Each structure stands twice: as structure tokens, then as C-alpha cells.
């Protein structure tokens, strides 16, 4: 009679089908959780990339705006001896606004701020740095064809044309703006300027004095791109950007004010 020798440890056995299924279930849960987190990370990365693009667009716009603001009101009449002979001759002295400098219509002089509103600002300055005065406008929907676009116009100032009726040449700087008020203005003493619905321009003595007292401009942009949705929340992506800049040059619109040229 042959004897069969048992091998292996006493009581040793393989996995049961139930144990194998439990192990596979646990492994599936772990792998599923890992892939879920990877998917969330990918969605977040995509969202942040789009937000970064919007932020960079806003940053470029604000940089351009700050460069322009630094040139507001230059060159102005303080830099010239008006008793000397000019070639060509000085512009016809304006008589419509006796509180303003008589030569605000001369294209060699930059008046400074000419109109302010919550979503609109008009001013003059040599923004190219070559001494040629430009008429600059930043305005939400300036062209009338892009409701949520902050647009910029730049044209060379024309002599004997009122600063507020200079031509415009619109270009879009930022799209999809939802800010209720892009611009906020502060006077020389830090007091915030209250803006009426129609804005403030120099066509009245009181408003001209307000413009000649503006020292600081705050800009607040909130951009919501309806075509780029956060894949995690399902909502359009929003990006905000704030900045503040101070005026360095004087105003030709009123005399005796903190920022006046005369």
C-alpha cells in the first residue's frame, strides 16, 4: 500500500470566491476615488487656466489705463509763456466756459479730465509721449455695438474743436464686463465723488471745479465669460481685478482748485 504525503502547512487553503470579490471591490473603490480626484484636479486646472486668461486680459487693460492716466493734462499751459508768439497762432479763445482756460481748444494743450462717469472717462494728454496731445475715452459700450465691452478711443486733438466733441476711434480692450461701476473717483482730500446718472463734465462751473479736484481714480473690473463654464460648478467663470492710480498733472478747466493749472 502506498502512502500519500500531504504537503503545505496544516489548515492552509486558498482564497474563497467571496474573499476575492471583497478584495476586488475594495480595490475598485480605491481606484475610483483616485480617478475621481484626478478628474476634479483636471477640471480645476482647466478653470484656473481660463480664469488666468481673463485675469491677464484685465491686467493688460489696467496697465494701459494707468499709463494713459499718468499722462493726463500734459503738456498744459503751465509749460508755456502764452505772451510769446506761437506758430501756428494760438486757437481762438473760447468764451463758452468763462471758468475754464481760454485756450482749452488749442491742440497743443492737454486740458486734463473732461468728463467722468461710473463706466466712462474722457481726458486729454500726450499718451504717446511725443508732445502731441490725444483725446482719450474709456467707455463701456463706447461704439454702441458691444454692451459688455470696455472700449478705448484715441485720436489726436483737433484745434478749435470742443474737447467733448472730438472724434472717436473705438477699439475693444476687455470683454464680458459685469461690474456695475468700473470707475470710482476721489478728490484731493480723499472724499469720494458722487456721480449723477449723466456723469460730470466741464459745461457748468460747479462740475468743472469737481473735475479740477479729482486726484485719484479707482478701477474695478469683474469679468464673467458666458462661454467658459466651470466644469465643477457648472457656472460661468468670474474674474475680478482692482487698481488705483493718482493724477500727476494739473487741470485747465477751473482756477483756484487743488489740481488747477491757474
Model-derived features with residue positions:
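Aliphatic-rich helix starts adjacent to a transmembrane/signal segment
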Residues: 2-3, 11-76, 256
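Exposed loop/turn and edge beta-strand positions of beta-sandwich/beta-sheet ligand-binding modules
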Residues: 20, 117, 213
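Short, glycine/small-hydrophobic-rich surface segments
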Residues: 47, 69-120
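Short linear sequence signals and composition-biased patches located at protein termini or domain-edge surfaces
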Residues: 129, 161-162, 167-168, 172-262
Amino acid at each position: 500500500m502506498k502512502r500519500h504525503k500531504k504537503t503545505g502547512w496544516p489548515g492552509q487553503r486558498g482564497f474563497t470566491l467571496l474573499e476575492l470579490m471583497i478584495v476586488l471591490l475594495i480595490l475598485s473603490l480605491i481606484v475610483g476615488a483616485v480617478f475621481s480626484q484626478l478628474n476634479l484636479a483636471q477640471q480645476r486646472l482647466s478653470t484656473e487656466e481660463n480664469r488666468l486668461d481673463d485675469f491677464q486680459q484685465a491686467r493688460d487693460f489696467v496697465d494701459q489705463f494707468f499709463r494713459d492716466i499718468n499722462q493726463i493734462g500734459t503738456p498744459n499751459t503751465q509749460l508755456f509763456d502764452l505772451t510769446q508768439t506761437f506758430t501756428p497762432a494760438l486757437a481762438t479763445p473760447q468764451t463758452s466756459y468763462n471758468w475754464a482756460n481760454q485756450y482749452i481748444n488749442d491742440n497743443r494743450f492737454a486740458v486734463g479730465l473732461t468728463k467722468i462717469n461710473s463706466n466712462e472717462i474722457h481726458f486729454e494728454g500726450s499718451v504717446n509721449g511725443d508732445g502731441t496731445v490725444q483725446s482719450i475715452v474709456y467707455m463701456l459700450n463706447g461704439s454702441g455695438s458691444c454692451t459688455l465691452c470696455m472700449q478705448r478711443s484715441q485720436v489726436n486733438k483737433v484745434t478749435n474743436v470742443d474737447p467733448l466733441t472730438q472724434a472717436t476711434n473705438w477699439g475693444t480692450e476687455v470683454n464680458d464686463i459685469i461690474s456695475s461701476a468700473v470707475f470710482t473717483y476721489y478728490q484731493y482730500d480723499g472724499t469720494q465723488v458722487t456721480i449723477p446718472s449723466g456723469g460730470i463734465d466741464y459745461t457748468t462751473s460747479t462740475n468743472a471745479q469737481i473735475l479740477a479736484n479729482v486726484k485719484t481714480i479707482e478701477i474695478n473690473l469683474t469679468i464673467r465669460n458666458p462661454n467658459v463654464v466651470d466644469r465643477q460648478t457648472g457656472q460661468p467663470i468670474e474674474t475680478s481685478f482692482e487698481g488705483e492710480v493718482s493724477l500727476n498733472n494739473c487741470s485747465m478747466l477751473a482756477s483756484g482748485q487743488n489740481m488747477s493749472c491757474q
